[in-house]
Amino acid sequence: MAIIFEDNIIRVRQLKDCSDDYSLFVKWLSDLDVCEYYEGRTKPFNYDMVLEKFEERAQGIDPVIVGIIECEDVAIGFVQFYATEPGEYYESDVIDRNNYKISYGMDIVIGDKNYWNKGVGTQTIQLLTEFLFNKKNADIIFIAPQTWNKRAIRCYEKVGFKQLKTIKDMELHDDEYKDGILMAKTK
């Protein structure tokens, strides 16, 4: 098992190209309460959809790195992170990219609702940003939650992300386009 980063409670390991790991994603992403925060309640995932989205990531073909979050040895969700190019995160009008050489985008899903509102997401985001700054040499990290996801926005602000701007019609969610908030954390 390839550990990406860990502390005494949280471990994030690389997604494996195997049915056990894909089945975790089906369990999380078919739960309508979880879907409300990830692609919408109108789009619960089945096994084929999980394979379509995550198989090439698990195989290392897609550059997005996916890690399964384990809290005290229980798989509870996942993170994704990837190097970004200038302009990819709608940041050109609010960030001078000449000041930043290496940037990453990231996101997180706590799929096990028993771990919601327990600080696990905040702790995982803190560990992930430390990993990206210290091991991947990032000097800026972006995340873009939807404007209505106040819990996520608070979580990101707790670990030092700042709101930069609203992105109109950022993503399709429950069959309609929703606005997002571009947030960034610098080294």
Predicted regions and their residues:
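Terminal substrate-recognition subdomain of acyl/acetyltransferases
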Residues: M1-A2, D169, D175-K187
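Conserved GNAT acetyl-CoA-binding A-motif
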Residues: N134-A144
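Conserved beta-strand-loop-alpha-helix junction that forms the acyl-donor binding cleft
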Residues: I143-I153, M170-Y177
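Conserved active-site tyrosine of GNAT-family acetyltransferases
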Residues: Y156, F161, M183
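A short, well-structured alpha-helix characteristic of acyl/acetyltransferase catalytic modules
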Residues: M1-E55
